[in-house]
Regions:
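Structural motif corresponding to the intra-repeat A-B loop/turn of tetratricopeptide repeats
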Residues: 63, 127-129, 163, 197
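TPR-repeat structural position
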Residues: 66-67, 130-132, 166
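Alpha-helical adaptor scaffolds
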Residues: 79-152
């Protein structure tokens, strides 16, 4: 199935998370200084390094250097993994002086993760041989933390259709269409999904006719 338009949907808005502003009394990307508990300076530095890597990935994405952008996003996610409470909480009893993020830092961590996974999916859809399983995986990670994200719903739908599950793909694309009812690519892939479901239904009917009669 042709992939025209699947990768570039929303590209006119640029990569996710581009152009963050600083607020009064805040550090880079709006993260407040201090107040995060043991190891806070190291955690702050690691968080800001991840934000920087994501920004570098965004620049590479805009330059169509998708492979290099993927590397930057992966590096950002690796840095964030060491700070993610979902990952580090089970280890707190074994590791002394584990940094505890402030609520604002944790929000920045999560939004940076979401942006990186969204942008990784976009990069993968630009490659000559698309890894649709990975596109779906990344898009579902976005939806876990940012329910209703239209780009993630759309990409999950495209990937799921390509992986041979038009019924589930239709669910994702219908949700995406509620957020972007006039988007040409969403409507295109929703139509392709309906055609695939109709074709599968006709094949099933023909199979049963052959079996019984």
């Amino acid at each position: 199935m042709a992939e025209e338009g699947a990768a570039g949907w929303g590209a006119e808005l640029g990569p996710e998370g581009a152009g963050s502003e600083r607020g009064p009394g805040e550090g880079p990307a709006g993260c407040s200084r201090g107040g995060a508990g043991p190891g806070a300076p190291e955690a702050e530095a690691q968080l800001q390094e991840a934000v920087l890597r994501k920004a570098q990935g965004n620049e590479l994405y805009r330059d169509r250097r998708y492979r290099a952008a993927i590397g930057k996003y992966h590096r950002a996610l690796l840095l964030l993994r060491g700070l993610d409470p979902e990952v580090t909480a089970p280890m707190r009893s074994f590791v002394a002086q584990r940094a505890v993020l402030s609520a604002q830092q944790e929000a920045l961590l999560r939004s940076t993760q979401v942006d990186c996974y969204n942008n990784l999916a976009a990069c993968l859809l630009q490659r000559p041989l698309v890894d649709y399983a990975r596109v779906r995986e990344y898009s579902l990670r976005v939806l876990r933390w940012r329910e209703g994200d239209v780009k993630a719903l759309y990409r999950a739908g495209v990937a799921t259709l390509q992986l041979g599950d038009p019924r589930t793909a239709r669910q994702y694309l219908l949700q995406a269409s509620r957020g972007q009812p006039h988007d040409a690519n969403v409507r295109k892939y929703l139509r392709l999904t309906e055609e695939r479901l109709s074709s599968d239904h006709e094949r099933e009917k023909a199979l049963y006719r052959g079996m019984f009669g």
